[in-house]
Amino acid sequence: MSLEIVVALNGDSSYPNSSISYHMELQFTIADKTYKVPQYISVECFARAIVWNLDDLNNLKPFVATIMDAPLSAMHQLDPEVLAFITGVCLQKFQLGQQEVNEHCLGHNLIDFDTMTFSQFVDLDTFISKGIAANIVEIAAILYGAPHNTIKRAPIEDIWGAVIAVSKWREQCYKEYDEFFELEDREGPQAPSEGGEANIQLMWWEAIMALANEDFLKIHQVVERPWREALNYLTWKKAQVQKQKLEQLKAKNDLQRRTK
């Protein structure tokens, strides 16, 4: 087993005004097989590595193996000092911190939150409710209108700012439409409890069917409408139903009083 650290130079030093950057490549070789720490953590790699709870030290080796796309058996063959060094590098690359919102990613543009379709809104809400980390590829694909196979290769830093931004924006939408989402007793969107994912999907399916007037053939038409237009109607419709229920209850109570 051998550990190799390579400092790579990007750019052309023969030109005085050229842009030159450096990056460190860390790799090790076991049985003629070389494994490298990637220059950046891709969206796909992040989704696979985030499942390891790093509070448990037993998960450090599989975490590093995931980052380096190496078998766990290779981790077991590393000297403790080498493993500790590689682990530190991987953890450093995995730290995201506060990232700016990128308007472009791999040739695709970030969608406008205020003009997204109802379909995009529903899909984002569903995936975020199920967990950002577990659905980061799907969320990023919607945000940038990119195919999954494209966006999963993007550096996680390039899309993380937009993911956090849409999550905060979603919370504001919930507060704005608290009558529809029934947030009177809650502070904002909640993580789904056991069976909650199915409830969220059912809630949106019922909402879509209400917009389509229970006509399956109209579903595509209504989900392509602006999200705000859809929520405005759904909020009004819900208020009308509640008003009707109150009127029916009042009529029932009046009838009971008259028959006594």
Task: Annotate each language-model stretch with its function.
Residues 2-256, 260:
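An amphipathic, hydrophobic-aromatic interaction surface with interspersed Lys/Arg
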